[in-house]
């Protein structure tokens, strides 16, 4: 579980995607671009935050 994740509007999400794509066109790997943008968002985000639970177990048995 992750607490305090930024809650982004659709517009904010779109801007993040565009920023990731911009960094990738400048030669940055996708993973590095995603990490960079995530750090930028965490550093500047002032809106709501959410708690997220990621379940990696495969329930299809």
UniProtKB/Swiss-Prot annotation:
This is UPF0181 protein Ent638_2380. It comes from Enterobacter sp. (strain 638). Belongs to the UPF0181 family. InterPro entries: UPF0181.
